[in-house]
Amino acid sequence: FNRFSKEFMKKAGFSEFTAPAELNESELKILGLETAELTVYGYRPVMISAQCIMKTRGKCTKNSSFTHMKDRIGEEFLVQNRCDECYNIVYNSAPLYLGTQKVKIQKLSPKRLRVRFGAERKEEVKKVLEQAIDAFGEKPQFDYTQEHFKRGVL
């Protein structure tokens, strides 16, 4: 996604877009976020698997649900089973959280901010929302990542 994509979408009649997760802060600044929504919290997909984890384990219930899997170093990843089409979405082990980047986000001036929830428990949702409403308060009391916002893809 780049300024040419943004211009194409504008000509096609789209008035708003969600800022691409792959771009870092300086790339987002060049792109311009005046008509964009910027995701500031949420577990991001890292992989879509065409093989169902539950089916492979012989535990398929044909009901979409969430489960977890660990990688070789013991990091736990949230996995959403999509039984309607027999595939899985594997999410990053830590959620994106840009609350500690308040000043930089204000300078980017996105039209709106998105807080995206998936499998969080009620208490977690409340905690994250309180921090977001508190204008990106202090460092959160949970593990998080800032993904590409600071370092970019390359």
State what each model feature region is.
Residues F1-L154:
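Active-site pocket-lining/capping segments in soluble small-molecule metabolic enzymes
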